[in-house]
Amino acid sequence: MEPADKNYGYRKKTMTIKEIITEINKIEIDIVDFISSYRSEQLVSNYDDWNYKDVIAHLLEWIMFSKNKLNAIVHNQDFQEISNIDIFNKQNYIKNKNNHITELQKKLIFELNEYKNIVLLYTEADLQRKDLPTGFSFELWRYMIMDTIIHPVMHLLYYLIKTKNYKLFFKLCKKYNDIFYCYAKGNIEVYSFYEYIEDSKKFIENIKELGEQYKNDDMIHAVLKANKIDGNI
């Protein structure tokens, strides 16, 4: 897949510590806005059908894990990797199921602020390293952006599609479009919801509906293409 300079505005090739901090500040605001949009939601959930509170709890656990890993790496300490992601996610779902959204929000914002402090322990040269034990073969800055921006935003975007909140989906997608393509080197597959889908039939119906509302928008067309949906709907 070639970089998306021509069609999608992809320009940036790397990120600095200051830029990563700025992106984390942005996601903090958008998480709070997301919670505000769904605070009155009364949806009863289960592990295969999350509500907005489950999404926030999931993000909290992953930000905490990523932060602890980076803290261990910078101090040359051992850390325990996740051996089974499904078990990790399910255990945390059960642990947080009855926690109030106010508590979850407070903890998540705290962890994101702690994450920024950990980022500051690294150097600009460290950000370009691919040999650190993150569990991935790409640069450290890409790992940080994956865990603090890409993964959280994709969960928010999926939930917005799931609940047909297309206006907020478009706004959020637009806001993070450049950073998504920077992270993914212009590859539209960064917008694939394959690993997030709960109900594939409903997802396809809703994302096609999204496409109908924004049929002339190149960014939304790319999202549809990444999810194997014909843009000419």
Question: Predicted regions span which residues?
Answer:
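Short, contiguous alpha-helical
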Residues: 2-8, 41-87, 129-189, 194-233
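Solvent-exposed interaction patches of small proteins and small membrane subunits
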Residues: 7-11, 15, 19-22, 76-79, ...
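An N-terminal domain-cap segment
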Residues: 11-49
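Acidic/His metal-coordination segments adjacent to aromatic residues that form catalytic metal sites
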Residues: 12, 89-105, 133-143
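Aromatic-acidic/polar surface patches that form glycan- and anion
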Residues: 13, 20, 24, 48, ...
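Alpha-helical packing segments of well-folded alpha/beta enzyme cores
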Residues: 20-23, 27-31, 62, 66, ...
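A short secondary-structure junction motif
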Residues: 31-38, 73, 122-125
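Internal, conserved structured core segments that host functional sites
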Residues: 104-132, 136, 140
